[in-house]
Amino acid sequence: MTYRCRWCESSDLMRAYHDEEWGVPLHDDNKIFEFMVLDAFQAGLSWSTIINKRKNFEKAFEGFIPEIVAEFDEDRMQMLMMDAGIIRNQLKIRATVNNAKQFLRIQKEYGSFDKYIWQFTGHKTIYNHLPDESHFQAKSKESDTMSKALLKEGFKFVGSTICYAFMQAAGMVNDHVKACFLYNKG
């Protein structure tokens, strides 16, 4: 039997996410933006709620293409508030449009958002070598630094806990436990 981190065992979608994405380093700006959106919407909710609605989010936010999302107007945001397939939180929807604009500005300044965001881990994956799930953490000094920098850049819904979840999703942090078959892979 293959051992996985216990948090993913609730569904096939969660297992697939764990096995194929979580902790794998991301350097594609559109995928990075996708996880920034999904992690912002996760605030106060379980990750399984977001994973179960992921396809709906992808459709609602035009494939997570920041250039398109940045152009969403008031009417488009109101339409999203009526979309039962996503989390209908006005603050999170508005934050996503705002964040797309900030994302594009930083992307232009740095040549890619990837170059900007990976600076918070020294452009490498941090391996925490967790013995088991009881050692999971909700944030780190790196996520604290990332959060402060993103807030200063005008991003919203980027608290340290959200940033840490993003760092795990984007492979900036690899928190697979030692017994997991993906431990120390990235």
Language-model regions, residue ranges each:
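HhH-family (HhH-GPD) DNA N-glycosylase catalytic core used in base-excision repair
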Residues: 1-186
